[in-house]
Amino acid sequence: AVLDPLLTVEQLHERCDAGRQERVRAICTSLRQLPLLRERLGGQGGPKLIAAIGFPFGALPAELRLAEATWAAAHGADELDVVPDFSALVEGDSSGFAEDLAAITGLGLPVRVVLDMARLPEDLLAIAVEASIDAGAAGVQSGNGFGPPCQAEQVAALSGLCRGRCAIKAAGGIHHPELAMDLLEAGAALLGTSSAPELLQALRRPIA
């Protein structure tokens, strides 16, 4: 992930180049940085470019979230990580929650729904997962990276809810190889981290 708004253009280029060199699957970034990273990464080949939508808390009207997603699709995003309308969820409007997401999946890009496992109670988490899948999401993400590090137990719980119907992305505080491996073993297919190049380098080092 390259989401820090204080990164300079030179630093953004460095992170892109490091990701490409280490063959990361994708780079997630903000709408502000999206065109710059698209230009740096070019077209075919190399990491995919993910746009963060409604980031970090999803506190947007549905039309603005869709507008962000539409803009991202028009400016080179390959995939979308979407923070949903948690307010609709807690107010019992699961249909509105799902319809908001369905409008975005209708754009034709793969969509991951960014949940908040650190704060959502189990019943709302289960509803959110079902609504996300019903809306056509390709995956769900454990959190937005704020708060405590993601734990293997959270990924295992999410895996139990998803039951193989969509991919799981773990995110939040993943800076050490041991945690990364634990999350993958628990059922994560993808890891969201600002330390991807460093993690990949560490995992390739021979064990002394």
What are these regions (language model features)?
Residues 23-25, 45-49, 76-78, 107-111, ...:
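Short, well-ordered coil/turn segments that N-cap beta-strands
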Residues 1-75, 122, 127, 131-135:
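Conserved N-terminal beta1-alpha1 strand-loop-helix module at the mouth
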Residues 16, 20-36, 55, 80-98, ...:
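Glycine-rich, proline-tolerant flexible connector loops at the mouths of alpha/beta enzymes
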Residues 1-2, 51-55, 74-89, 134-151, ...:
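Glycine-rich phosphate-binding active-site loops on the catalytic face of alpha/beta enzymes
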Residues 31, 35-57, 92-119, 149-176:
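Alpha-helix-loop-beta-strand connector modules within alpha/beta enzyme cores
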Residues 64, 69-73, 79-139, 143:
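Conserved anion-binding
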Residues 12, 16, 34-35, 69-70, ...:
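Generic structural signal for well-ordered alpha-helices
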Residues 60-74, 120-131, 156-164, 168-170, ...:
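Catalytic cores of alpha/beta
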